[in-house]
Amino acid sequence: MARNLDPKCRQCRREGEKLFLKGEKCFTDKCAIERRAYAPGQHGQRSGQRLSGYGVQLREKQKIRRLYGVLERQFRKVYAEADRRRGQTGENLLQLLEGRLDSVAYRMGFGASRAEARQVVRHNGVLVNGKRVNIPSYTVRPGDVIELAEGTKGHLRVKAALEAAESRGFPEWIEVDAKAGKGVFKAYPQRSELSATINEGLVVELYSR
């Protein structure tokens, strides 16, 4: 299966902001953005080049892809579905990305990062409505119950991720019983509940060209 093998800290530096790809490290002063807040590469510190309108749109799309750990082909499929749905395409896009099983598992604290949560899903560590689902892109629907498989609940990394997520607080659109390793996806998130640093409108403009 294709994967993005670029170092995670390098990806954050490329986008110029934290994408929270390395779990707890992103919340400490060891985060690469805290230490080297400039683009990677030989000329990163001197990079003052202005992007064209297309370049800005492309950069935003790449940022969202990296944030959610989605490859180009997958992203295009999600965008096409968002465009078919009623409502604003950009908001639909973010809701669909948040509704992926790997994203929901991450939000519920089943992994310290989306990549870690994705691995838990792939290794048959997550149940949806009582049935094992090992497809990270599986679409979770409002009302679905997501829980850790019994054999996964005791994993130290999973327990640590759950504790950290509980201490930070869970998003409003999910309800989690951290002790039971179980939660409910109550609804798709509203735009106001998601990161203000994302400009999904630029992606809509890019695909409308």
From Swiss-Prot:
Matches recorded under Pfam families: Ribosomal_S4, S4
InterPro entries xref list: Ribosomal_uS4, Ribosomal_uS4_bac-type, Ribosomal_uS4_N, S4_RNA-bd, S4_RNA-bd_sf
Entry's Gene Ontology cellular component terms: small ribosomal subunit
Keyword annotations from UniProtKB, A to Z: Ribonucleoprotein, Ribosomal protein, RNA-binding, rRNA-binding
Domain (S4 RNA-binding): residue spans on this chain: 99-179
Biological process (GO), any one: translation
Keyword S-adenosyl-L-methionine: no
Molecular function GO labels: rRNA binding; structural constituent of ribosome
SUPFAM superfamilies xref list: Alpha-L RNA-binding motif
SMART domains found in the cross-reference section: Ribosomal_S4, S4
Lyase found in the keyword field: no
Family: Belongs to the universal ribosomal protein uS4 family.
Protein task: One of the primary rRNA binding proteins, it binds directly to 16S rRNA where it nucleates assembly of the body of the 30S subunit. With S5 and S12 plays an important role in translational accuracy.
Subunit structure, interactors included: Part of the 30S ribosomal subunit. Contacts protein S5. The interaction surface between S4 and S5 is involved in control of translational fidelity.
NCBIfam families listed in its UniProt record: PRK05327.1, rpsD_bact
Listed name of the protein: Small ribosomal subunit protein uS4
Species whose genome carries this gene: Azoarcus sp. (strain BH72)
